[in-house]
Amino acid sequence: IKIQMREVFGLKFFRIVVARITNNSVKIFGEIKGWTYPNKNGLQLDTLRILSDSPEYVSELIWATTMAWALEQTNCENARLLAIYDEDGYSKKLVRYFRLIGFRVTKEVGSSPSDLLLRLIWGGAGTLMKGDCRKIMSKLERKFKNLNLSYPA
């Protein structure tokens, strides 16, 4: 797991990567990118990518790392993301996936004038969702405990 972060004018831009390093080769399994601003609702998640040939639980590991980092290194308590609308209906699957993680729908961002700022921030229209970082972290902790893995940390 690698966390990259840079701060500009009070905004923290981050990238969290899960990868395997072997013999000078790096195989990336997944990553999440986003930014924070100094507010309890300041964790903004922009890009999530999980490769299809990734080992099990890479997604959960990325989410747990993101929530732990936000809770420990920022004053953020809640995260927001936008499931972007697309032509093939993939956004419905994303909304279902994000709900399973612990997010809830807060607004459908469309083409109305009141949505203009959100469209500029997020880069498109879609389903805006919000999640409580502590609740998501607790849910992931329970899932990891139920795996009954015997690997030392």
Whereabouts are the PLM-identified features?
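Non-catalytic substrate-recognition and accessory regions of acyl/acetyltransferase enzymes
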Residues: 1-57, 61-153
